[in-house]
Amino acid sequence: ASDESMIETRCVLNSHSTAETTLDSFFSRAGLVGEIDLPLEGTTNPNGYANWDIDITGYAQMRRKVELFTYMRFDAEFTFVACTPTGEVVPQLLQYMFVPPGAPKPDSRESLAWQTATNPSVFVKLSDPPAQVSVPFMSPASAYQWFYDGYPTFGEHKQEKDLEYGACPNNMMGTFSVRTVGTSKSKYPLVIRIYMRMKHVRAWIPRPMRNQNYLFKANPNYAGNSIKPTGASRAAIT
């Protein structure tokens, strides 16, 4: 057989636009922002439910991107990928419920807070496509702010609360509560990975890209006395 009978070439008309240079395009990739463990035993979430406060600073990959700007305003799309620790898909039904900032969170798997007619819920089986929900802009301020010089609360601040310095209360986006649905306890340990994608993005005051390791989750401090270059030496490149 000749080459032309094995490889068929077609005319492709590529189209490009300035939309590929927008903030929406730059932030349009979903990134990991949280992970929830629902084990069968232990001290963390052993009762088949968990509350995850929305936090996009827990993983450096997403945090470095948002800290390219001082202020941002966006809607967030969350995708929940659930499986067992071995990656197996099991016949388990889950409920994901969004709890706005300040609203009461469920304190047990059978709490009546799960039956509220106010908070939106999504029910999905592990064999279904991953649950996906959108959360609108939630801040009482005009934008989320990634650089904040202050405490998250008013009043007296004791020394043991120093690690909270730099956490901005305007960035609170709410909580996702998840539970296994059923009258009896689930027999499967589960791991839920949460991915976030930003939509309708507006941003102000660009900043240099982060290239040093983080020290704390609440603020962007770095070790100024031990700065390390992140790139490899280019002296030997030929």
Where are these regions (language model features)?
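Viral structural modules
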Residues: A1-T238
